[in-house]
Amino acid sequence: MQSRIVGLAPAFSLFPNLNTPHKTFTFHQILVLIITFTAYASFHASRKPPSIVKSVLGPPSLNSSSIDNGWAPFNGTQGTKRLGELDLAFLSSYALGMYFAGHLGDRIDLRYFLVFGMMGSGILTLVFGLGYWMNVHTLGFYMSVQIVCGLFQSIGWPCVVSVVGNWCGKEKRGLIMGLWNSHTSVGNILGSVIASSVLDFGWGWSFVLPGVLVLVSGVVVFMFLVVSPNDLGFEELGKEIEIEMSLGENVEESLRKHEAEGAVLLENVDDSSFAIGFLEAWRLPGVAPYAFCLFFSKLVAYTFLYWLPYYLRHTAVAGVNLSHKTAGILSTVFDVGGVLGGISAGFISDKIKARALTSITFLALSIPALIMYRVYGSVSMFINIVLMFISGLLVNGPYALITTAVAADLGTQDSIKGNGRALATVTAIIDGTGSVGAALGPLLAGYISSRGWNSVFFMLIVSIFFAGLFLVRLAKSEINTMRSGELIASSVP
């Protein structure tokens, strides 16, 4: 047997019982899902502090011209615009870095690369928080930290999706990745709660604790993560076994044989897979429409991510203005809805085998949900929570589906013969394009909010419309496929 154990994580030397045959394939599969879940949840937890501290750094209200409150240089009449520019600094470098990260991720050890990104992200998050104790009031300092931090953060997503794609086959991929992708919302919730809880002690603490969380998670990844089943001698499920069926073949018997093979030890490891080029990946069927759909979907999701606590702080609910801490914690309801949205979208798309149709349905329903939230969200706390939950469910559903199951499907599709090394590149293209929208959304919100929040919500609704528009052709194709399947089924005696 050709050995691939040299690059195994240190924990497998310290704890020999973790190796095969002491532990099953399923055990390692679950372990990988837990580790990558924790890793990316910590990434998102460290992104949340800027949105929580906005109401502390910026002016007390949109109409205020006072500089007696807040934190220079964000507390003047241009405060909201500068906060939007700060978001742009992080998210634009994140989007740019995403393309390079995916390209590199297909070519170097994913465990080392992921740990490198986590350590850099944790340190830069800590450095931003140090600005509080060092009494830094220079815009360039905070912009520079956010730009470099965005580059480190961009490493995370292509790495974790590629690893999970190696360990999980296409069967129930939507549901599994829908559950797994709740790390985004869980991380947002965790980051919001941590940052809000320590905000009264000084806004610097809101960055320090999430930064430490990323560093600790990075150590766990370095110690335990196994990038591919091949490293333990298992067959890689991301590379689907082709089952050739002719008219005279017993299909049921072939399927049973395929399932019985399961996860078997490899006698020889095939290293023939190759990384595809950036432009070649763009030309893969479905990549461009989903990438541009995610551009607008992520624009909406990240506008909520970065501005919802600020919106809640400056919008009276039942005639009462919320405190900084209450607004930050209340904003987690949107992410709780997002958890259910990602799981629901994955489950439904698995059942009907139509990713685009599922996404476009969620997007269409999110438009009236956002209108209702803006109009009726201030009536009472209960109505605000219910409508925020529904909005989070519908907005994050397609976003979660596209960044996980769809990206994994496109990166392992038949046109590239299941080339697993294309997965990180395809993932980076889709999420990188989405991240350009994510950078644009919070920036526009910072400028448009000076005209009133109705203008911001109008921008979000228009963005959702365009997101759905890019999937119309794919959805029509899926509907035709479903109808063809029904006709074939009805013709069978």
Swiss-Prot record:
CDD domains: MFS_SLC37A1_2
Keywords in alphabetical order: Membrane, Sugar transport, Transmembrane, Transmembrane helix, Transport
Membrane-protein topology: Multi-pass membrane protein
Source taxon at top rank: Eukaryota
Cellular component, GO annotation: membrane
SUPFAM superfamilies, per the entry: MFS general substrate transporter
Family according to the record: Belongs to the major facilitator superfamily. Organophosphate:Pi antiporter (OPA) (TC 2.A.1.4) family.
Protein name: Putative glycerol-3-phosphate transporter 5
Organism: Arabidopsis thaliana (Mouse-ear cress)
